[in-house]
Amino acid sequence: MIIYPAIDIQGGQCVRLTQGKKEERKMYFDSPQAVAQRWQAEGAEFIHVVDLDGAFGKGEENMEAIEAIVKAVEIPIQVGGGIRSIEKIQQLLDLGVTRVILGTKALTDEAFLREAIEKYGDRIIVSIDAKEGYVATEGWVKTSSRRALDFAKSIEEIGVKRIVYTDIAKDGMLQGPNFDEIQRMKDSVGMEVIASGGISCETDLQGLKEMDVKGVIVGKALYEGKVQLGKLRGMDI
């Protein structure tokens, strides 16, 4: 199981939001690339980057920070947040990003998703952010009428191989993931599921590994010292 340390960027800084709420923001580090180097030094195999300004529709202001992260580490990077064009996908891949995560646009524009999959294959991930079972969009500000499980099945038919599944109610709460919903998603599709939201301790990670989850994104628990990457090396996680 791959542990993906999360680096959320807003205004060029490494921050965390609680349940995706802009007003519940905590800044941890000025330098996202220094954080990436720290996680790499502690044994991370892959880094998960979210452009929060992009997710909230603010454009290109964090591309410089993303490029700095790519240059600062040797491990692969996946990036999401406000990616709504083939040109933006190409721009990120040209910077050296390994995988690109699509969210809102994958839900609202099937033709775009098909084109992205046809062009880039498994370098495309779709993020399914669920709020009470329904897909949330626009940086989690809006909730669609599409059930998360139905959406997952539909994108699998298109050719998506990997999803990030987030339970928004759990995100940043340090109260444990929604094991039942993660299991339901795993049982419903054949895609690789990367779980996100709510990790609070090593026991949560062990539980997800026992469910055969292939990857877990860990954010606040790392920044608050609840989970230590170096310690995980000897824990068979």
UniProtKB/Swiss-Prot annotation:
<dbReference type="InterPro" id="IPR011060">
    <property type="entry name" value="RibuloseP-bd_barrel"/>
</dbReference>
<dbReference type="Pfam" id="PF00977">
    <property type="entry name" value="His_biosynth"/>
</dbReference>
<dbReference type="InterPro" id="IPR044524">
    <property type="entry name" value="Isoase_HisA-like"/>
</dbReference>
<keyword id="KW-0963">Cytoplasm</keyword>
<dbReference type="GO" id="GO:0003949">
    <property type="term" value="F:1-(5-phosphoribosyl)-5-[(5-phosphoribosylamino)methylideneamino]imidazole-4-carboxamide isomerase activity"/>
</dbReference>
<dbReference type="InterPro" id="IPR006062">
    <property type="entry name" value="His_biosynth"/>
</dbReference>
<dbReference type="GO" id="GO:0005737">
    <property type="term" value="C:cytoplasm"/>
</dbReference>
<dbReference type="InterPro" id="IPR006063">
    <property type="entry name" value="HisA_bact_arch"/>
</dbReference>
<keyword id="KW-0028">Amino-acid biosynthesis</keyword>
<keyword id="KW-0413">Isomerase</keyword>
<feature type="active site" description="Proton acceptor">
    <location>
        <position position="8"/>
    </location>
</feature>
<dbReference type="GO" id="GO:0000162">
    <property type="term" value="P:L-tryptophan biosynthetic process"/>
</dbReference>
<comment type="pathway">
    <text>Amino-acid biosynthesis; L-histidine biosynthesis; L-histidine from 5-phospho-alpha-D-ribose 1-diphosphate: step 4/9.</text>
</comment>
<comment type="similarity">
    <text>Belongs to the HisA/HisF family.</text>
</comment>
<dbReference type="InterPro" id="IPR023016">
    <property type="entry name" value="Isoase_HisA-like_bact"/>
</dbReference>
<keyword id="KW-0368">Histidine biosynthesis</keyword>
<dbReference type="GO" id="GO:0000105">
    <property type="term" value="P:L-histidine biosynthetic process"/>
</dbReference>
<feature type="active site" description="Proton donor">
    <location>
        <position position="129"/>
    </location>
</feature>
<protein>
    <recommendedName>
        <fullName>1-(5-phosphoribosyl)-5-[(5-phosphoribosylamino)methylideneamino] imidazole-4-carboxamide isomerase</fullName>
        <ecNumber>5.3.1.16</ecNumber>
    </recommendedName>
</protein>
<dbReference type="InterPro" id="IPR013785">
    <property type="entry name" value="Aldolase_TIM"/>
</dbReference>
